[in-house]
Amino acid sequence: MKKSGLFLMCSIIAVFLLAGIAAGKETVVVYTSLETEEVVEYLKAAKKDLPDLDIQSIRLSTGELGARMLAERDNPQADCIWGWAVTNMSEFVPKGMLVPYKPKGWEKIPANFKDPEGHWTAIDLYAAALVPNTKVLEEKNLPMPKGWNDLLNPVYKGMLIMPNPASSGTGFLQVASLLVMMDPDYKTKPVEQNKAWDFLKKLDQNMGQYIKSGSKPAKLTAAGEYAIGCSFAFV
């Protein structure tokens, strides 16, 4: 059950401004918000194409990655970013913390999927999605939800899990999508007056847990710990 509000995930090869790793160094540190399984594949591809580099990856949630970058602004510890939400990436471009990089074939990438100056290049789109465990729903005699509004049904109390929007890019996507979907006038009013906040307050009454990972709600739901996980799907 995908919902509107597609956001880009970005893949850039951008050396931080002031980064202390010069050309010829063997070690490259990569920060990433990609899922662990994806990082493994990215590392395989990178090490195959760049055998002379020792690529070290550090995986962080979307919010944690941003906080770490800011904390290290005067003493950068990373050289590259793989897979970070463009909504976050765009906040760091004006801060002068990213150097443009245009990969081979840059001119073939549609304008919507890249920064015009080359600060980021998109690798995919991802959408907010509801992930029900049909077995749990059947065992507990719970109805199959058809959309977000159905999650307000008190029968789901304690059976929902969602990523924390303060630390998870997926959680941020979900909240941002709801703000757009539930209030047609969202562009003309302060965000705190958006009608979706009333919905989120009611949803909170049914929420069993908020977690920092965007994929964990789907995984825990699949394991049978929850009936419905608020997670994401790639497009």
Feature locations, PLM:
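Bacterial N-terminal signal peptides
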Residues: 9-19
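Short, well-structured alpha-helical segments in soluble
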Residues: 67-75
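C-terminal lobe and pocket-closing loops
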Residues: 222, 227-235
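Short, polar/charged alpha-helical segment
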Residues: 28-58, 130
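Bacterial N-terminal signal peptides that target proteins for export
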Residues: 1-9
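Boundary at the C-terminal end of the N-terminal hydrophobic targeting segment
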Residues: 22-24
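Extracytoplasmic ligand-binding site segments that recognize negatively charged/polar headgroups
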Residues: 33-40, 63, 77-223
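Short active-site oxyanion
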Residues: 27-29, 54-55, 77-79, 224-227
